[in-house]
Structures are given as structure tokens and as C-alpha cells.
Amino acid sequence: MNSTSLFLFSLLLLLVTGAIGKKTKEKFLQSEETVRESFSMGSRGHMSRSSEPEVFVRPQDSIGDEASEEMSSSSSSRRRSKIISSSSDGSNMEGESSYSKRKKSRFSQDALE
């Protein structure tokens, strides 16, 4: 009797697990299809009717503006890196470890002697 109930219980568990797995697989396929549809949609939220890719053309005068903006941002980043690289105690603010600070100070003391 005990082995029969164990067999029936394992059979029931197998059926329940299979049913749960099947439902999970169906939900996964549905969500995968939804993701595919959302990626195939156009940037405006509707399906693109033409098979040609959209090409964005930039006006000529905006190219020069962008170049000057890029140059000003690079000079400001240079200034920022100079500020970051030195602080009041001589260590950098980028996260120099205390171990490397001690190594540097020991090396400089050894070089002076």
C-alpha cells in the first residue's frame, strides 16, 4: 500500500510539474512575441509601412555648431581633470589608495637618503 501511494503521489507531482512548465513556456513565448513586436515598431510607436530605412539629414549650419560645442566641452573636461588631479594634501581625488600613498612616500624618503 505504501509503495502504491508513493507511486501515485510521484505521478501526480509529475503531471502538475508538466502542466506548470507548459503554462510557463506559453507565457514566455507570448512575452517574447510582444518584445519582438515592440522592437519592430517604428520610433513613433506604429509599424513602419515602407521597407526603406529612415534617414535623417542634418542641416549644414548645425554641423559647425556641433564642432564648436565639442571643442568647448573637451577644453572644460581638460580643466576638470586638472582640478581633480590635485587637491590640498597632494593626493588625487580619483581614489588613490592609502597603500599607494605610503609606497610613494617611502620611495621619496629612500630617494632623499
Swiss-Prot record:
Q: Which UniProt keywords apply?
A: Secreted, Signal
Give the residue ranges for region: Disordered.
31-113
Bias regions of kind Low complexity — which residues?
38-50, 83-98
Q: In which tissues is it expressed?
A: Testis.
Which InterPro entries does the record cross-reference, listed alphabetically? Svs4/5/6 (IPR035409)
Q: What are the annotated GO cellular component locations?
A: extracellular region
State the conditions that upregulate or repress this gene.
By testosterone.
Predominantly, its location class is secreted
Which subcellular locations apply to this protein? Secreted, Extracellular space
Give the signal peptide as a residue range, or say none if absent.
1-21
Q: Which cysteines are joined by disulfide bonds?
A: none
Q: Which domain of life is it from?
A: Eukaryota
Q: Which family does it belong to?
A: Belongs to the SVP2/SVP5/SVP6 family.
Name of the protein in its database record: Seminal vesicle secretory protein 4
User: What organism is this sequence from?
Assistant: Mus musculus
Q: What is the lineage of its organism?
A: Eukaryota, Metazoa, Chordata, Craniata, Vertebrata
